[in-house]
Regions:
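Divalent-metal-activated hydrolytic enzyme cores
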Residues: 145-223
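Exposed alpha-helical structural elements
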Residues: 4, 19, 66-69, 73, ...
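Residues that form generic nucleotide/phosphate-binding pockets
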Residues: 8, 23, 73, 77, ...
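Glycine-rich short-loop/terminal segments
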Residues: 32-118, 189-220
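Short HxH-centered metal-ligating active-site micro-motif
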Residues: 96-146, 153-154
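BZIP DNA-binding basic region
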Residues: 1-34
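General structural signal for secondary-structure boundaries
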Residues: 7, 133-139, 165-172
């Protein structure tokens, strides 16, 4: 409490490989949209109190409670960072940490977490409290072992995506590849015709559309 107070794969192989190459090339572009709403919010005691547990397929009830506690601790770490800087952490599915708290750079803001070969979950903060970025979705579908991803807003609101037993990797990769291509198209429109604010608004709409499509292909979405 004191701490809180301180605050047919072969047939599609070429297409899949092309999608992966395109997704890899898009990583740098995606980082620009790590926060779709660019105004960071402060972390408050109310924010931390707002964090709730949620039922998911990947973790049992006890581990869901551990996850809730991890979210609160991470948000307290985020409160100590410069405005807009993300913080993240990775866990195995027994909720044993695979990393320490990882802090994004003051310049780039976005946090970069390593990939693992064991099934795992990642949690990270979203200072502006927005939904997943295109880069988040890319990381989620690109890493087979990543089963659960959570974004914690500085207001305590949580977004989560989970690979269920019905997850279709090929379709999911295709959905995110299409998202990447559409965002690239928008980025190529001169800013005089599509100002940054409108670009971010359209990007967010595309992300929500992609999430709806992912839900049809075995991705569970929680908020």
């Amino acid at each position: 409490m004191n701490a809180m107070r301180r605050i047919d794969y072969a047939a599609r192989k070429d297409a899949i490989n092309a999608q992966k190459r395109a997704a890899y090339a898009a990583r740098k572009n995606f980082s620009v949209y790590s926060s779709l709403n660019m105004e960071p919010k402060p972390v408050t005691m109310q924010s931390i109190s707002n964090i709730k547990s949620f039922n998911c397929e990947t973790l049992d009830g006890a581990k869901q409670q551990q996850l809730q506690s991890a979210h609160k601790r991470l948000l307290m770490t985020a409160a100590k960072q410069p405005p807009g800087v993300e913080v993240g952490k990775a866990f195995d599915l027994n909720m044993k940490p695979l990393t320490q708290d990882v802090v994004g750079s003051a310049e780039g803001h976005s946090v970069k977490l390593p990939n693992f070969n064991v099934p795992y979950a990642v949690i990270h903060t979203h200072p502006a409290c927005g939904v997943f970025s295109p880069g988040d979705l890319l990381s989620f579908v690109d890493n087979e072992s990543l089963k659960l991803m959570i974004a914690i807003g500085h207001n305590g609101h949580i977004f989560a995506v989970e690979k269920s037993s019905e997850y279709n990797s090929n379709e999911a990769n295709g959905i995110v590849w299409q998202l990447s291509a559409e965002i690239d198209r928008l980025k190529n429109i001169p800013r005089a015709e599509l100002p940054d604010e409108q670009l971010l608004e359209q990007t967010e709409k595309l992300v929500w559309q992609a999430i709806r499509e992912l839900q049809k292909n075995g991705v569970k979405f929680y908020e």
